[in-house]
Amino acid sequence: MPTVFPDDSVGLVSPQTLHFNEPLELTSGKSLAEYDLVIETYGELNATQSNAVLICHALSGHHHAAGYHSAEDRKPGWWDSCIGPGKPIDTRRFFVVALNNLGGCNGSSGPASINPATGKVYGADFPMVTVEDWVHSQARLADRLGIRQWAAVVGGSLGGMQALQWTISYPERVRHCLCIASAPKLSAQNIAFNEVARQAILSDPEFLGGYFQEQGVIPKRGLKLARMVGHITYLSDDAMGAKFGRVLKTEKLNYDLHSVEFQVESYLRYQGEEFSTRFDANTYLLMTKALDYFDPAAAHGDDLVRTLEGVEADFCLMSFTTDWRFSPARSREIVDALIAAKKNVSYLEIDAPQGHDAFLMPIPRYLQAFSGYMNRISV
């Protein structure tokens, strides 16, 4: 835990909760009569409101993207390596907004929130939300903050999908889109991984149809298994081999079915257990479904070029060689469509052994390229 914060840290930060009374119509046909969004901001909004950057989080992310909530915090925000003074998203130049999306479990309205219509926890009654719904709620957030146009919308993985959707839904409100380790839609394999994770949760006896909070229980077993499956897909074989290999946790093999014998087993169990204590099961179901549903080209005859013909932003896409969850080929699909649509796009494939999680890591070439692009953005 830091006693003095590094010079390149945004330091102590405090979240804000913004309440919205205007009904939000959702893709599903349902609506939210009112809702909260929890945000953090870093840096200062300039007089012309031209330096605002929106950070869109991935599946298990939230509003705490940088800095510390207290001097006792063991770790900073989830993208602290990229946000702060002198970092790629330089808070000396940019006003940075990070939020917890609707359906999340870190303060924004979601399944774990109180339904104002009933006075009870939403649970399974919270409506399905999509990437398009998130972007519409983020546009209202921008209005509330007095931001007419984002200098950049930035995200990795599911966050990159939101950044891409911003350029489609609100082309005039985004100058630059940074879409990192992402894809124009999920592959069948990715949908399959998500379904296995969902089934782990749904089959937990303590899930109780999504109303587990009313009974004072948590489907920890299902959440743990879901996270273990997901975590395997976020790492590359090289990364797992380098980190764990076949190293034993025990002195020798026990030749039974119940011992945790390999270090990699212990690691996955720890990650799953830790996740199950801080994340909401209904939120996990919603987030994975939002991933599955994302397919902006579906409304344009499955033609991604046509889908992107109306965008006005300049684009930067980055992918990582060992990412097999969202492989470089998926980023190149977007790049090729943008080129065919005659849009400005930069692309970098970064040699990194960490797999999908590389977009969260302080990899020198990645940070250098990220900084290089952000420094070109005029504010």
From Swiss-Prot:
Residues making up the signal peptide according to the UniProt record: none
Functional pathway: Amino-acid biosynthesis; L-methionine biosynthesis via de novo pathway; O-succinyl-L-homoserine from L-homoserine: step 1/1
Domain named AB hydrolase-1: residues: 51-360
SUPFAM superfamilies linked to this entry: alpha/beta-Hydrolases
UniProt main location, coarse: cytoplasm
Record-level GO cellular component terms: cytoplasm
Subcellular location: Cytoplasm
Keywords attached to this entry: Acyltransferase, Amino-acid biosynthesis, Cytoplasm, Methionine biosynthesis, Transferase
E.C. code: 2.3.1.46
Active-site residues from the entry: 157, 323, 356
Site feature (Important for acyl-CoA specificity) residues: 325
Pfam families linked to this entry: Abhydrolase_1
InterPro entries registered for this protein in UniProt: AB_hydrolase_1 (IPR000073), AB_hydrolase_fold (IPR029058), HAT_MetX-like (IPR008220)
Family: Belongs to the AB hydrolase superfamily. MetX family.
Function: Transfers a succinyl group from succinyl-CoA to L-homoserine, forming succinyl-L-homoserine.
Name of the protein this chain belongs to: Homoserine O-succinyltransferase
Species of origin: Pseudomonas paraeruginosa (strain DSM 24068 / PA7) (Pseudomonas aeruginosa (strain PA7))
